[in-house]
Amino acid sequence: IGNIPIANTKIMPYGWRKAAKGRTVWRIVEEVISQGLESRVKQLGFDSVHAADSEVGVFDFRFCYDGNKESYVNIKSAVLGGRTNKDDISKAVRLIDFYKKNPSANLYIATFVISFNDDMTIGLDKCIVFPTAWIPDVYVNPSNNGNLQSSMYKNLRTATKRTPQEFLVVLEQANQVAL
């Protein structure tokens, strides 16, 4: 995909300043990734790629590859060199509903590590793909609208390998604690 142009030094002569944050550009990054995959389905070897119908669902796009079942991807962004925080993954109740309707679904978090370049572009430096069901630190934050949060979803070495149904049990327990 290459760097994503956001602005230029004519309209932002002092650079990024306080705008150099993931929350400033995450939606654009999400769209660039989704549309880039959709427009290059065959070229990239996918059977199909479809954007999510809802902007507030648990995934941003779904895809099929090599005749296998459909998989789902939730796109996140993280700033290169940023500190490790508990980040919002999705609303716990929406994830619970999703896994109840799709008990064997492959749902992934694809985190694009981004950098803010002097030429007012966003660099896509790295992509980390992590199965949602493998999140080791399952925590539902009651003071943050019941969001599933994790600080370890960007490190596969910390993964707790489990099936979607095993994850559903853990998530439901964490959600009960949060209520």
Feature locations, PLM:
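Nucleic-acid endonuclease domains
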Residues: 1-57, 65, 71, 77-179
